[in-house]
From Swiss-Prot:
Covalent lipid adducts (S-diacylglycerol cysteine), residues: C23
The protein, known as: Photosynthetic reaction center cytochrome c subunit
Residue sites binding heme 3 per the record: M236, C247, C250, H251
Localization: Cellular chromatophore membrane
Subunit-structure text: Component of the photosynthetic reaction center composed of protein subunits L (PufL), M (PufM), H (PuhA) and cytochrome C (PufC). The reaction center interacts with light-harvesting antenna complex LH1.
Posttranslational modification: Binds 4 heme groups per subunit.
Binding site for heme 1: M94, C107, C110, H111
BP terms from Gene Ontology: photosynthesis, light reaction
Length: 383
């Protein structure tokens, strides 16, 4: 009998230790984000938040270029995108981009040695299109990026290929005849949940419907399947993990679907999803033929972007550091006649400005990071 107890206690201790490995080490802290007692809150762990801030520090901007001087088009050949710059500003921009994208490889990562005008290197073709992407983002997608904007560093962080890109995942091989349809793999793409492991392809590459919640008490008229709902929740887990926030950063706890009760950040997220689709479909996919196999997935699709590509665990990329404003080359020289987004946000969201039951968020619980919720994404009336 005593022997049984001696064996049982260590076994219980081992099981308990394994279970606790899945828990986050305390102390978590809670920031109220709405009415009291209704779970409108953001949860932060000061230790993890401090690490996130260190990982999302911006780099210093280069000194401003001297005004005036010859146009880059008069000096260099085959400048197609940045031709409206002076030579001084063009050179400054090239130096900055090199430090943001290929600090080890240098200029020859994108240029043929001895012939900078040549297009006989795929990275130059890609980088030219990426300049167009950044300029279009900063000039035409203010509903998403507001005045903060983006730079090459927002995604690349000193790497030729951004750390957080994705391709369509075929999933692990299945020896049995029953396939789990991408579920129960504890994948990082869905924050290690049991949800389908590829929330990207249907929603951030394709334009499948994300909403699955019925708007009536009975399910009449809502033909959404359980599988579709699980895919949607997989996307929500990915967004939450990418931004380092709870569901209530965008949604109201009592009614996730209702735009009138949602927070202003949901409007920004609506535009963000469409912005990501625009990037993947109109900027990345057209480059697929120019890319080598090392820049593609098992199905031959190119490395694409998702929320994590820019945000990297921060509710705003680089916690809202405004790097783009120091580089005029990263904006289109003249405003576009129409933004690339052809859709309008749901009509009810306009009412969410006054109706959303949320208060101005309190400062985050870590002194160095007073911003994670306080400096929230722009409210709908600013979009």
């Amino acid at each position: 009998m005593n022997l049984g107890k001696q064996l049982t206690l260590p076994a219980v201790a081992v099981v308990a230790s394994v279970v606790l490995l899945g828990c986050e080490r305390p102390p978590p802290e809670v920031v109220q984000k709405g009415y009291r007692g209704v779970a409108m809150e953001q949860n932060y762990n000061p230790r993890l938040l401090e690490a996130s801030i260190k990982a999302n520090l911006p780099v210093e901007s280069l000194p401003a270029a001297a005004p005036g001087g010859p146009s880059v088009s008069d000096v260099y050949e085959n400048v197609q995108v940045l031709k409206d710059l002076s030579v001084a500003e063009f050179t400054r921009t090239m130096v900055a981009v090199t430090t943001w994208v290929a600090p080890k490889e240098g200029c020859n990562y994108c240029h043929v040695p001895g012939n900078w005008a040549s297009d006989d290197i795929y990275t130059k073709v890609v980088s030219r299109r990426m300049f167009e992407l950044v300029r279009a983002t900063n000039s035409n997608w203010k509903d998403h990026v507001a005045e903060t904007g983006v730079t090459c560093y927002t995604c690349h962080r000193g790497n030729p290929v951004p750390k957080y890109v994705w391709v369509t995942d075929p999933g692990p091989n299945q020896p049995s005849g029953v396939t789990p349809t991408g579920q129960n793999y504890a994948s990082s793409t869905v924050a290690y949940s049991a949800l389908p492991l590829d929330p990207y392809t249907p929603f951030l590459d394709q334009s499948n419907e994300i909403r699955v919640i019925g708007q009536t008490a009975l399910p009449a008229g809502n033909t959404t399947s359980l599988k579709q709902a699980e895919w949607t929740y997989g996307l929500m887990m990915q967004i939450s993990d990418s931004l380092g926030v709870n569901c209530t950063f965008c949604h109201n706890s009592r009614s996730f679907y209702d735009w009138k009760q949602s927070t202003p950040q949901r409007t920004t997220a609506w535009y963000a999803i469409r912005h990501v689709r625009d990037i993947n479909q109109n900027y990345i996919w057209p480059l697929n033929d120019a890319l080598p196999a090392s820049r593609k997935g098992p199905y031959g699709d190119p490395f694409k972007v998702g929320c994590m590509t820019c945000h990297q665990g921060a509710y705003k990329p680089l916690y809202g550091a405004q790097m783009a404003k120091d580089y005029p080359a990263l904006y289109e020289s003249a405003p576009a006649e129409a933004a690339p987004a052809t859709e309008e946000a749901p009509a009810a969201e306009a009412e969410a400005v006054e109706a959303a039951p949320v208060e101005e968020a309190a400062p985050a619980p870590v002194e160095q990071a007073a911003a994670p919720v306080e400096d929230a994404a722009p409210a709908p009336q600013q979009l």
